[in-house]
Amino acid sequence: MKSKIIRAFTISWSMDFVTGMLPDLQKKYEVVLLSSPGPELDDAETQYGVRGVRIPMERQISLFHDVVSLLRLIITFIKERPAMVHSMTPKAGLLCMVAAWLTRVPVRVHTFTGLVFPTATGLKRRILMFTDAITCACATHVIPEGEGVMADLRNYGITKKPMKVLGYGNIKGVDMMHFSRRPEVMELAQKLKKEGMFTFLFVGRVVGDKGINELCKAMEKLSGFAPVRLLLIGPYEDDLDPISQESKEIIENNMAIEYVGGKYGDELLAYYAAADCFVFPSYREGFPNTVMEAGAMGLPSIVTDINGSREIIVEGENGVIIPSRDENALFKAMLEMVRNKKNREYMAGKARGMIASRFEQNFVQKCLLDFYDEILKKHV
C-alpha cells in the first residue's frame, strides 16, 4: 500500500511548482493536492488523475476565515490520515502545519520559498515572524528554498531546527528543452524585435515589491540616453501591493515602456528570445524562477542583491547584481548593459550553461524525491 502525501498550497496557481513531477510522485505515493478552489486544481485532476481537496484560504491575515480554514484542515487530515503533509506558501504553511501537528501527522514538511517579514515593519513584521516561528515549530522538517532564506530563518531566530537546502536550491527547476530557442520560438521572436532598439524584459507580478517603481524611474531616465525599450510581462495586483501612481503614469505615457500583460507558453519564450537583457529589481524573493528562465534562454540579467537572485546570478559571469531599492544603481547597470556589448555578449554566452549545470528540472525533482524517500522511511 502506497503512503499518502498531501501537497498543500494557499491558492491553486502555486501548483505549477509541483504538477510537472506528479507522474513520478504517483509511481511511489498516493498524492493528494490541497488548495483553495481554482482552475489549476481542476486541471491537475483532469490531466494527472490526482485527487484534489478544496479548502478556501485567504492570503492576507483574516482571523475569522483563518480559523474556519484551520478547522476544515483538521477535519480533512483526520479523514485522510496522510503519512506526510508538505506545504508551500505562507498561509497554507501556517494552517497546514498547525492542523497536521494537532492531528499527529507523522511527517510535516514546510518549504519556505521566500520570507515576507524582512521587508515588513512594525506590528506586521512581528506578526509575520511569529507566524513563521509557529510554522517551523509545528513542522518536523523545514526546507528553505535557498541558502539566503535559510540564513534569514536562522539569523532572525525563527527556528533552531536543522534545515536543509535541496540540491543547489529552487523547488521547480528549469525544463531546458522547453526553455530553448527552438525554431518555432525564434519565428515568433522575430516579429517582436525592433531593429536598432535595445530591449529590456521584466517578467513577474507588476507590484511594488518587485521594484517596478524604481524600474520605471530608471527607464524614464535611460530612454533619454539610448534607443531602448522595456517590456513588462505579468499581472497587476492593486489589491495586494500596488505600484505608485507616478509609476502607472510613466507606464502609460512613456513610449519606451510597453505593458504586455500575461504571456504563456511559446509566446512567453518568444519575448525572452526577443530581449537583450532581463531586469529583475525585486526587494525580496525565495528563488525567482523567471531569472532562471531568462538565463536558460541565454539572457544576461540585472538583479538585486537579495535571496535567490544572488544565488542564481554570479556577478560579471551571467549577470550583474545591484543594491535593492536603488534606482540610480539600476539606471547605471542598465546603461552599462546597453553600452558594453563585449561584456553583455560574454554574460549571455555563459547564461544558459550556468542554469543547466545547477537547476535542470530533472535534477531538482530527483533531489525532492530522494528527500521524500529518506524521511518517509525513517518516520512511517
Question: What annotation goes with each model-predicted range?
Answer:
Residues 77, 262-263, 270-275:
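Short alpha-helical donor nucleotide-sugar binding micro-motif in glycosyltransferases
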Residues 42-45, 229-256, 260, 343:
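Short, structured helix-loop element that forms part of the nucleotide-activated donor/catalytic region
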Residues 329, 336, 343-358, 364-370:
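A short, well-ordered alpha-helix in the C-terminal region of glycosyltransferases
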Residues 264, 283:
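Aromatic "clamp/platform" in nucleotide-sugar-dependent glycosyltransferases that forms part
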Residues 291, 300-303:
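Short hydrophobic beta-strand element within catalytic cores of glycosyltransferases
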Residues 53, 133, 137-185:
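Donor nucleotide-sugar binding/catalytic pocket of nucleotide-sugar-dependent glycosyltransferases
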Residues 15-20, 198, 202-221, 328-329:
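A conserved mid-protein helix/loop that constitutes part of the nucleotide-sugar donor-binding site
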Residues 315-316, 320-327, 336-342:
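Conserved acidic donor-binding segment of nucleotide-sugar-dependent glycosyltransferases
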